[in-house]
């Protein structure tokens, strides 16, 4: 998991430099991450696409098993409970937005 997260951050920074130049800034990194399209870290993770509307990248995972020498996929990439997750995200976001306008 740590390697996967680092690879996403590294690729986002690489794209930020390629598209926005040096030095890196928070806005350039955000733009770099939001330009990830079907990035899979050479098969380490499910292909992700990050947009301004969806920073989750797709939310897919798979079950793997160690065979004594390597990790072997036991399932295809799956996105479990996405309907439930997005329902809660939208509800909580609406509640937060409402509370902010009442301040």
Give the ranges of each region predicted by the language model:
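Extracytosolic ligand-binding ectodomains
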Residues: 1-103
């Amino acid at each position: 998991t740590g390697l996967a997260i680092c690879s996403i951050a590294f690729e986002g920074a690489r794209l930020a430099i390629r598209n926005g130049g040096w030095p890196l800034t928070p806005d350039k990194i955000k733009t770099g991450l939001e330009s990830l399209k079907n990035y899979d870290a050479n098969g380490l993770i499910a292909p992700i696409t990050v947009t301004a509307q969806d920073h989750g990248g797709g939310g897919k995972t798979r079950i793997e098993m160690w065979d004594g020498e390597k990790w072997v996929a036991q399932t295809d990439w799956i996105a479990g409970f996405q309907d439930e997750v997005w329902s809660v995200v939208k509800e909580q976001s609406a509640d937060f937005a409402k509370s902010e306008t009442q301040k």
